[in-house]
Amino acid sequence: MLVLGIESSCDETGLALYDTGAGLLAHALHSQIAMHRDYGGVVPELASRDHIRRVLPLLEQVLADAGRTRQDIDAIAFTQGPGLAGALLVGASVANALGFALNVPMVGVHHLEGHLLSPLLTREPPPFPFVALLVSGGHTQLMEVRGIGDYALLGETLDDAAGEAFDKTAKLLGLGYPGGPEVSRLAEFGVPGAFELPRPMLHSGNLDFSFAGLKTAVLTQTRKLANTCEQDRANLARAFVDAIVDVLVAKSMAALRQTGHKRLVVAGGVGANRQLRERLDQLGRQRKLDVYYPDLAFCTDNGAMIAFAGAMRLQAAPELARREYGYGVTPRWDLADIRLPSAA
């Protein structure tokens, strides 16, 4: 089965072709970072218009790269939510039109399920069950994953996501957009322990997160350093990253203890952070745990994860293959609400 995946939930347009027999055949991505940089963040209207411009050329690109035609497509998977409503509608509209024209089934995919399953695209995918740490610009969650469509929420952020905290800290430090990678790069030059920042909810006794207080602590420090030198900024960035990593690692280890699982999957844009990976890998070796990550190319939003998640859902529950076109979008959507019929 050849599945076309379409991702358009925010500021990246991604398309991919995944074959259930041969694996990932092709993927293409257009990032809108340059367009949004002048605004310091994503402008929803501009994002939607750019998706419209990019989606069909990217479709032709992946077909050419895979040596396939539109008539070879057996099913279409698209990001149904969560995300920006206008951006989601672009992908959904293209999926509906193509599905109708080609008379092939389509399936709406939860954006976070795509991230959660993206490590399964690697050469050594994790077997079920496992704990997943989803850390991105808009979400920070710990999930227990028992199988395709069988997910249980263990904990989540009560305010800012880790990625949001990175972006807001970047602005406080006068860094560019997107903020997450800029903060991480600056932190490489920082001296550990030069600043003391809180580890919110580190000892809360549950698996929830909170990063708003950490952001406020960074703001307080920047105000004290009115004439901040570059080394001070690097030291503060290092303190911030260390605080984030400490909390993410501690909560992940607690989730593994609570569930009894020995496998941890880390996905989402923040999952590309070097310090986070090094800490988790070190603990994995010490505690005989297996830690899995997606390829770096698939940490951020992409069409490959949507094509793969759609293919897995259709294989697990063929009744999801519908030709009832006119699918809408779900800008707000809890991952735990998408159980397959067989997992209900």
Curated annotation (Swiss-Prot):
Would you say which domain of life the source belongs to? Answer: Bacteria
Question: Which Gene Ontology BP annotations are present?
Answer: tRNA threonylcarbamoyladenosine modification
Q: How is its cofactor bound, per UniProt?
A: Binds 1 Fe(2+) ion per subunit.
An example Pfam family from this entry, by short name, is TsaD
For this UniProt record, the keywords arranged alphabetically read as follows: Acyltransferase, Cytoplasm, Iron, Metal-binding, Transferase, tRNA processing
Co-factor requirement = Fe(2+)
**Any single GO CC term annotated in Swiss-Prot or TrEMBL for this entry:** cytoplasm
**Family indicated by similarity:** Belongs to the KAE1 / TsaD family.
**Protein name, per record:** tRNA N6-adenosine threonylcarbamoyltransferase
